[in-house]
């Protein structure tokens, strides 16, 4: 049974990890109110400019509640300072996945990016989700129809009067 928690209570007791590598570090929050848990590299790596690399964390999920997912996201400092980010962000970790957590990092910077064993490379957030039941029904007609990207307008108007016209 999942216990109720608030934003100040860590949820690590409802998520269990197992080491796949001797040089692993368990995910940890940098501050008490940090939403994400930092993930660490287990090896020294280099990502060339405009390249990507799958980086191991040395941990795998042993247990996670069925109504929770992990989302692997970029660390803002790496993206801002070096142009290095999680390519498929957020990378979804389903509650039944049992392989090693790996991070797909891309280097959009102009210089090679060096990763040392133990460096913080990404963060993981644990988020509850719901799975809806889908019913087959006819689609109602709406004014918008199948119009998509940009169909409701782009840009901005200069005045409120122009907007209301």
Model-flagged regions — what are they?
Residues 1-165:
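DUTPase catalytic domain/fold
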